[in-house]
Amino acid sequence: MDKIAIINLKGGVGKSVTACNLAAELAAKSQAVLVVDLDKQGNTSKFFGTLDYDRPSVAEVMLGENTAEEALVCETGTTAVHLLPCDMRMLKANRTILMDNGPRQYYLRDALEVVDDNYNYCLMDCPPDLDMGSINALCAADWVIIPVDCDEWACDGMREILDQIEQVQMYYTPRLKIMGALLTKYRRTKYAAGVTAELLKMPGVPLLQTVIRYTVRVSEAKSAHMPLRVFMPDCSAAADYKALAAEGDSI
């Protein structure tokens, strides 16, 4: 199972939208996909209509109170896409893990071992901060995708992310690689050109060839709880996420 952490310290850059739509596109290529929601806001879980406090979440899985198999949501509305949901219970998990005097970074990696052979891909939707969910995702991952929206503050927090990735590569997970920065909400503006130029100057951060073009259809599809390939398959962003799946599959 190839594990991809989708991370940025900024909110609203398209992490959850990317996780959901990339999962749907990979599934359309006959790949079995596990989506792990690690953000306490639960946007990815809400997208798949699975936010339910009466069932186990990824928080209980990381703490060993339930297995990943017990917490899996298989009825996501998207064939071959399963979900480990997240909600505010992640706050408790973060506090508990922080108080552990032993290795804190492998809770998620170890919890996912039981389902490792069941999927081709695992997409981990990280919160917009470097909490224990994000750290555990990076230490479990093979690859990192960094969504970057095209506004004037787009690269805020990039240095902190890159420093953390470097620490993980050095001490915990040497195989971890940056797949690339993914431009989202892309329009041909001076801000987009400036963001592109700034990213190209950053050492060790490849820029993915695919960009996700801006369209209101993204918000509409999110409100409808449907991936773009189902909601509006002929829109520009649907084509872009299809291209992203092909690009990621080829790396």
Explain the meaning of each model-derived region.
Residues 1-251:
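P-loop NTP-binding core
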